């Protein structure tokens, strides 16, 4: 919404500049999008009166005029405007004037005739051109007065974004009310006098819909619809972005911008019988003021007479009942329409009007009478007429109810986070137009004003208190509270575990806890399956001791259907009945199981498929364990269904939590499977998360030493590495195996293992003697324990 700053300051004029006023409005929640001057700077332009007009002796399109500017001799000015005539008044740029664009006026000659200035059109003083030619000023414009002063061009247009909840601010009055509150000033409202009825003519109004709780109308006869709109009204409307039309339209638009009340004038002669406020009849048609014909539905409210619809209520009038130059008598409307009765209807017809915008957001239901009196006053002053009595039709039970809201000091302090003085709360709400009553217990009972539809709960009142206090005045303070350190999350959630496995390319399988007894026996020949007394089918007759009993049939099913790469996992229960003497002793162990068959990666254009090996599969299991920060060790597995050289038992603190590896080749043959990788992990152990300890990184250089050992090939590498780490002590930072060699130069039954040893001290540089001593000690211990010898280079 655009408004004139000068117009606003006639209502309330705080002692602040334009920029500060703009900032105030923004902080009040009325965001200023733009603050633009009405006209660019210029000087030396005054009101002039054209005394004579003669034809230029040497140019058909030029005239030689004499112009009175109120001082000294009349000026001779050559002018080419088609509308120049004797007796008219227009802006005159005198010698030395500087117009917008730094255009300087000098004495000169046009086709041989001296010109002592320039008669100006609107565009030459940075105003909008309405006609081709000079800007014609009213006959009563005082000659010689500075045009900026006369047209009040030292003004700004304030463009404000009104939020949907602040329909009360769609007017000068609404904005002025906010400025007055924040600056603790009184508004200078114009004196609105009621216009007494001079005739008895009136129109009966019948409301037959719930969408119009209050409707006012007035008959005005013998109106001069051709009366000129005064310059001050034209300028006010222009600076609000509204074009002038005729005196009646301009008056209703002026009241709309001034008070926020939409109004409409009908040609009285075109109304047949009673005025009805009703719902449209199905397929009823209406030609609107914009010449658009619309077909109405019964959820659209209309103003009608006994024969036809005259207007879409609250949106736009109809062409058939509009005021024309031949109109003498009018019926003036001012009404309160319920927001829900208007909302969405304008958009349905592709319309967006000032009236619908205001009615949709809520117009003050007490405003129609004030607006009717204001419009009557202006029409009487500017266009004359005889006024009938104001007709009021009302359904008072449908008017908005002003319910009291209870507000406690503690609620204000708690919601805002700082203490607000009780006196300020009462004063701020009172200045906003609320009726505030202080109860015996100090609690406030607050009745919002009729124009504030957005005040419904106590939080709304607190928001208003903060807004008036100033959001930029909210005190900065750290909250004080009693806190307890949150307990460390020591569980790796199942959902996270599931997501981790899915990310590795596995698909989840959900199966029965029963299995094929034959497969159970194949997987673990040493244990007899626990059979069900009444199985649901012959292939689900045993309680599964391993989830592989369920996953392997899934793999077989998919491989038999041309799936070359199969990867499944299951989170389920397995039954540990090896040590159970009875059903009561039977343990159900939550377990994560993995099965993978096929290539390491899916088939792709950029690389040939590579078969998965033990280390690929072990890496995936390690990634699952790493997600839960489980610290594990790997030792050779002795499980009979696993490949003896490509499997590992997984230990935590020396206790097995599962295994990983390849199925035994003989079992793969029995089950008609290619290379199949499997793993089972105790779910409870995987979900147990371990706290990571902080260790400061050493700033001092590390030293690497390598040793190659000839050692029996039946000694576990893990045992050798653990012995090296134990013997190396605190100075040995880390060690790893980087080479294994058998063949020429290494006797049968032995292999060469090469280890890297990284030495580092946390707080100083190590000396060679310390490292040599540590290396010698490790070599001696390995020789004594495993009969290891250093391999010659």
Tell me the role of every PLM-derived stretch.
Residues 5, 23, 28, 63, ...:
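Glycine/proline-enriched, intrinsically flexible loops and inter-domain linkers
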Residues 47-76, 234-235, 252-320:
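Conserved mixed alpha/beta core segments that line enzyme active sites in large multi-domain catalysts
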Residues 2, 20, 27, 431-434, ...:
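A carboxyl-terminal module marker
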Residues 174, 405-409, 413-566, 705, ...:
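Extended, well-folded interaction surfaces typified by the phenylalanyl-tRNA synthetase beta subunit core
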Residues 39-43, 196, 482-488, 511-528, ...:
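Beta-rich nucleic-acid/ligand-interaction surfaces
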Residues 181-207, 383-412, 419:
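Terminal amphipathic helices with adjacent charged low-complexity linkers/tails
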Residues 1-195, 331, 350, 354, ...:
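Phosphate-backbone binding interfaces of nucleic-acid-interacting proteins
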Residues 111-124, 131-136, 148-149, 156, ...:
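Mobile "lid/hinge" segments at catalytic clefts and subdomain interfaces of large enzymes
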């Amino acid at each position: 919404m655009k408004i004139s700053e000068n117009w606003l300051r006639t209502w309330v004029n705080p002692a602040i500049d334009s920029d500060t006023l703009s900032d105030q409005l923004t902080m009040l929640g009325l965001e200023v999008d733009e603050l633009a001057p009405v006209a660019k700077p210029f000087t030396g332009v005054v009101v002039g009166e054209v005394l004579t007009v003669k034809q230029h002796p040497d140019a058909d399109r030029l005239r030689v005029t004499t112009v009175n500017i109120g001082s000294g001799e009349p000026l001779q000015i050559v002018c080419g405007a088609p509308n120049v005539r004797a007796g008219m008044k227009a802006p005159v740029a005198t010698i030395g004037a500087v117009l917008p664009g730094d255009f300087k006026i000098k004495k000169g000659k046009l086709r041989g005739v001296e010109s002592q200035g320039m008669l100006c059109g609107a565009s030459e003083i940075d105003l909008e051109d309405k006609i081709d030619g000079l800007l014609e000023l009213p006959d009563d414009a005082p000659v010689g007065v500075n045009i900026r002063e006369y047209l009040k061009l030292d003004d700004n247009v304030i463009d404000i974004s009104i939020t949907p909840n602040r329909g009360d601010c769609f007017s000068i009055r609404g904005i002025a009310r906010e400025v007055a509150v924040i600056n603790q000033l009184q508004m200078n409202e114009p004196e609105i006098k009621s216009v007494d009825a001079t005739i008895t003519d009136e129109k009966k109004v019948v409301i037959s819909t719930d969408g119009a709780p209050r409707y006012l109308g007035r008959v005005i006869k013998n109106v001069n619809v051709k009366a000129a709109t005064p310059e001050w009204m034209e300028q006010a409307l222009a600076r609000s972005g509204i074009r002038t039309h005729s005196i009646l339209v301009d008056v209703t638009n002026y009241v709309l911008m001034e008070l926020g009340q939409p109004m409409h004038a009908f040609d009285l002669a075109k109304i047949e019988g009673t005025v009805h406020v009703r719902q449209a009849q199905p397929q009823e048609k209406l030609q609107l003021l914009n010449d658009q014909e619309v077909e109405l539905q019964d959820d659209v409210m209309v103003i009608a007479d006994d024969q036809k619809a005259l207007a879409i209520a609250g949106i736009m009038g109809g062409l058939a009942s509009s005021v024309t130059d031949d109109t003498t008598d009018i019926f003036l409307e001012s009404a309160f329409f319920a927001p829900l009765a208007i909302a969405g209807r304008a958009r349905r017809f592709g319309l967006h009007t000032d009236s619908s915008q205001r009615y949709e957001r809520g117009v003050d239901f007490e405003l129609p009478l004030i607006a009717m009196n204001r419009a009557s006053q202006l029409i009487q002053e500017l266009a004359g007429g005889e006024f009938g009595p104001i007709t009021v039709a009302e359904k008072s039970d449908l008017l908005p109810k002003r319910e009291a809201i209870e507000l406690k000091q503690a609620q204000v302090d708690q919601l805002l986070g700082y203490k607000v003085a009780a006196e300020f709360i009462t004063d701020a709400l009172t200045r906003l137009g609320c009726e505030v009553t202080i109860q015996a217990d100090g609690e406030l009972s607050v009745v919002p004003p009729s124009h504030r539809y957005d005040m419904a709960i106590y939080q709304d009142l607190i928001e208003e208190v903060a807004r008036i206090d100033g959001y930029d005045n909210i005190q900065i303070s750290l909250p004080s509270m009693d806190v307890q350190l949150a307990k460390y999350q020591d569980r790796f959630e199942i959902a996270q575990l599931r997501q981790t496995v899915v990310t590795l390319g596995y698909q989840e399988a959900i199966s029965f806890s029963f299995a094929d007894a034959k497969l159970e026996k194949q997987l673990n020949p040493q244990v007899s399956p626990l059979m069900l007394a009444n199985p649901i089918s012959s292939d689900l007759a045993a309680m599964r001791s391993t989830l592989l009993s369920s996953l392997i049939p899934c793999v077989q099913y998919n491989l038999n259907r041309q799936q070359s790469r199969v990867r499944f996992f299951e989170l389920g229960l397995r039954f540990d009945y090896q040590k159970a003497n009875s059903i009561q002793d039977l343990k159900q162990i939550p377990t994560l199981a993995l099965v993978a068959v096929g290539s390491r990666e899916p088939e792709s254009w950029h690389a040939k498929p590579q078969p998965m090996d033990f280390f690929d599969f072990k890496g995936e299991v390690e990634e699952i364990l790493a997600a839960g920060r489980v610290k594990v060790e790997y030792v050779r597995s002795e499980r009979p269904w696993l490949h003896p050289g490509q499997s590992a038992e997984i230990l935590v603190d020396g206790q097995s939590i599962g295994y990983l590896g390849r199925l035994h080749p003989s079992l793969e043959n029995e089950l008609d499977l290619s290379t199949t990788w499997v793993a089972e992990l105790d779910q409870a152990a995987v979900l147990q998360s371990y706290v990571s300890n902080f260790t400061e990184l050493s700033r001092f250089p590390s030293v690497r030493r390598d040793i190659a050992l000839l050692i029996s090939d039946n000694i576990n590498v893990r045992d050798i590495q653990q012995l090296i780490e134990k013997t190396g002590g605190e100075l040995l930072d880390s060690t790893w195996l980087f080479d294994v060699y058998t063949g020429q130069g290494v006797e049968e039954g032995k292999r060469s293992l090469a280890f890297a040893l990284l030495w580092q001290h946390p707080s100083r540089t190590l000396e060679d003697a310390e490292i040599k001593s540590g290396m010698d000690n490790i070599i001696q211990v390995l020789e004594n324990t495993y009969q290891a010898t250093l391999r010659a280079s």
